[in-house]
From Swiss-Prot:
Domain named UBC core: residues: 4-149
Family named by the database record: Belongs to the ubiquitin-conjugating enzyme family.
GO cellular component, one term: nucleus
Annotated pathway: Protein modification; protein ubiquitination
Catalytic site positions: 88 (glycyl thioester intermediate)
The organism of origin for this protein: Dictyostelium discoideum (Social amoeba)
GO molecular function: ATP binding; ubiquitin conjugating enzyme activity
The protein's name: Probable ubiquitin-conjugating enzyme E2 W
UniProt-listed PROSITE patterns: UBC_2 (PS50127)
Keyword presence, Lipoprotein: no
Enzyme class: transferase
Length: 149
């Protein structure tokens, strides 16, 4: 574990514990390599009253490399969230920036959920899930074509 990696994650973990964004709370963060974060559906959204869990896995290249972020347990039914928990969101892959933080990623995912008007899976859900099996979403080549949901 490099010192930059550890310092950055310790700072972000402390910030997330002491000043969490609305509807976001850390449930597991004792291990710097893997965190579990609870996400609650926002008031007025189609996910209001629902609770989800995100898993963040960090490599020693963080923050230069993006974390692996997936929903664990039962993922929300959403046009950009696959039934295996993989999330089609460009900032997790091609548009990652070291300026992004765990909190900002959580807020982006929460915003994506809050803006959704229909609970449906991606049209290629079955095909995608059977093709990727147990691969990390970071090993998948993503094509981003719909920013409206």
């Amino acid at each position: 574990m490099t010192s930059r990696y550890a310092k950055r994650l310790q700072k972000e973990l402390l910030d997330l514990k002491t000043n969490p964004p609305p509807c976001i709370s850390i449930t597991e963060g004792d291990n710097l390599d893997k965190w579990v974060i609870a996400v609650d559906g926002t008031e007025g959204s189609i996910y209001q009253g629902e609770h989800f869990k995100l898993q963040f896995k960090f490599s020693s290249g963080y923050p230069l490399d993006s974390p692996e972020v997936i929903f664990i347990g039962t993922p929300p039914i959403h046009p950009h969230i696959y039934s295996n928990g993989h999330i089609c969101l460009s900032i997790l892959y091609d548009n990652w920036s070291p300026a992004l933080t765990v909190s900002s990623v959580c807020l982006s995912i929460l915003s994506m959920l809050s803006g959704c008007t229909e609970k449906i899976r991606p049209t290629d859900d079955s095909k995608y899930v059977s093709r990727v099996l147990n691969k990390s979403p970071k090993e998948v080549r993503w094509m981003f074509h719909d920013d409206t949901v």
